[in-house]
From Swiss-Prot:
Pfam families: Portal_Mu. This is Portal protein. Induction: Expressed in the late phase of the viral replicative cycle. Expression of late genes is activated by the viral late transcription activator C. It comes from Escherichia phage Mu. It comes from the Viruses. The keyword Membrane does not apply. It is found in: Virion; Host cytoplasm. Cleavage by the viral I protease yields a C-terminally cleaved portal protein competent for DNA packaging and procpasid maturation. The keyword Membrane does not apply. InterPro entries: Portal_Mu. One of its GO terms (cellular component) is viral capsid.
């Protein structure tokens, strides 16, 4: 394929061979994890973070891998953020006021990505950037009919990459060179999740979470040692003056063995005493572990009450924290959408579109982050609101996440209740018996009469509500009463009573 333009407008020669399969990277791609978290100290952690600031991302990436693997609480909280993205519906939308060709391109991309088996896994793997700051997936290109498309995305170890020393925001593959190997255009799906402002090596949550991770592990280790001796009697061996080192070692072995096997032997002349059982409290250890886990939850999800039970008011505070978590999720999908548009949508369009591509009018992925409305509350409010305003049905369906029926699709309906007329008495009067029926009906109350009568009555109240608000209108209710015009209402009620009386008399006469 000839030269094409990347998303920044620079021409390049497209190569569909995977960059990681080149001979110069063969040894680099075979690396294994170093597991720097084993025995990590605050000083060692600080050194790894400083290395990442200078562009060496290897140790920090390996450290993040270990943290997620070893800490179940950290893993659980990260999983909530990653899986929240996968739970969202999405679509490829064209630019605003799209032309026919732009709509065609968007439909083509939407259909392909929804059918792509690798896309959901790619979304999940992109979530790895939340902790590590970046996620790198190599694109394997192939053919689908006449379309040049990705057939697979391969997640690559973040430790394989470094930052360009001359531009710490540019990721490159690590090789034997000082600057690293530049990434192949259209060859990588790179997602950067910025949890903080800074260079690529400082974006990840790992830099914040490493400290509660270390302090929690210290407390867990100390707590385990406390449990080993808690409740056990103190064992003291006594040896006579002049005992040899061998005799002392024999006594020490007996002291240690008797704690595990409840038996042992010692030389004559030596004694073994049992003191009071070791006591103490586990509260300090558990308090430290609890603090560390809450700090981890705050850093990842913005709060703690979406994770565990709280004290009084936990329900309302939990709802607030859940709203914060939704805001974090929306920010995550906003960053992810930009990465997808840059590294997947644009290359697909550049390689397969029949028209000239305008960088400013590209289709893009749109995640549906809207929440379904409370159907009970809306069902009660909509009829009342509809009395004073025009409400589009499409808006109600969007709020409730109820789709519009397509074609002759079956729809749910309420079956009308058929009254049982068997036990009802047949009407005693007929049109022939009462030729004046139409005249009596005209004397009754029509909907229009009711509206004309009520409008003057309520006009002062409505005006006060619109001008000052409902609360002010309630306070002024007593003063508004004299302004209400009830003349029409009195006349309407008089007519209604008269008609009801006439119908009652005629019905009674017919029964006789």
């Amino acid at each position: 394929m000839g030269r094409i333009l990347d998303i920044s407008g620079q021409p390049f020669d497209f190569d569909d061979e995977m960059q990681s399969r080149s001979d110069e990277l063969a040894m680099v791609m075979k690396r294994t994890q170093e597991h720097p978290s084993s025995g990590v100290t605050p000083n060692r952690a600080a050194q790894m973070l400083r290395d990442a600031e200078r562009g060496d991302l290897t140790a920090q990436a390996d450290l993040a891998f270990d943290m997620e693997e070893k800490d179940t609480h950290l893993f659980s909280e990260l999983s909530k953020r990653r899986l929240a993205i996968q739970a969202l519906e999405w679509r490829i939308a064209p630019a605003r006021d799209a032309s026919a060709q732009e709509k065609k391109d968007a439909d083509m991309l939407n259909e392909y990505l929804h059918d792509a088996a690798w896309f959901e896994d790619a979304l999940f793997d992109a979530g790895d950037a939340i902790l590590k700051g970046y996620s790198m997936q190599e694109i394997e290109w192939g053919w689908l009919g006449k379309m040049r498309v990705p057939v697979a995305l391969h997640h690559r170890d973040p430790a394989l990459f470094c930052a360009n020393p001359d531009n710490l925001n540019e990721l490159r593959l690590r090789d034997a060179s000082y600057h690293g190997l530049e990434l192949q255009p259209f060859g990588w799906f790179m997602h950067r999740a910025k949890s903080r402002t800074g260079y690529v090596g400082t974006n990840g949550l790992v830099r914040t979470l490493i400290w509660p991770f270390i302090f929690k592990n210290y407390s867990v280790r100390d707590f385990a040692e406390f449990l080993e001796i808690y409740g056990l009697p103190m064992r003291v061996g006594k040896y006579p003056t002049g005992s040899t080192n061998r005799e002392k070692a024999t006594l020490m072995q007996a002291v240690m063995d008797i704690g595990r096997r409840a038996g042992g032997i010692i030389p004559m002349g030596m004694t073994l005493d049992f003191q009071s059982a070791a006591d103490g409290q586990s509260d300090p250890f558990m308090a430290m572990i609890g603090w560390a886990e809450k700090a981890i939850s705050k850093a990842i999800l913005g709060g703690t009450l979406t994770t565990e039970a709280g004290d009084k008011g936990a329900r309302s505070l939990g709802e607030v924290h859940d709203e914060v978590r939704r805001e974090i999720r929306n920010a995550d999908v906003g960053q992810l959408a930009r990465s997808i548009n840059r590294d997947l949508i644009y290359p697909l369009l550049a390689l397969n579109s029949d028209s000239t591509i305008d960088i400013n009018r590209l289709p893009g992925i749109v995640f549906d982050t809207s929440e379904a409305g409370d159907i009970t509350a809306l069902s009660d409010a909509i009829p009342k609101l509809a009395a004073g305003m025009r409400i589009p049905v499409s808006w109600i369906q969007e709020k409730l996440h109820i789709p519009q029926p397509v074609g002759d699709e079956a729809v749910f309906t309420i079956q009308p209740v058929v009254p049982d007329n068997g036990s009802q008495k047949e009407a005693a009067l007929s049109a022939e018996d009462i030729p004046q029926e139409d005249d009596i009906d005209r004397m009754g109350v029509s909907p229009e009469d009711w509206q004309r009568s009520v409008d003057p009555l309520l006009k002062p109240v409505i005006f006060s509500v619109l001008k000052d608000g409902p609360e002010a209108a309630m306070n002024k209710a007593a003063s508004l009463y004299p302004q209400m015009d009830d003349a029409e209402l009195i006349d309407m009620l008089t007519r209604a009573i008269f008609v009801a009386d006439i119908w009652g008399r005629l019905d009674a006469a017919a029964d006789h």
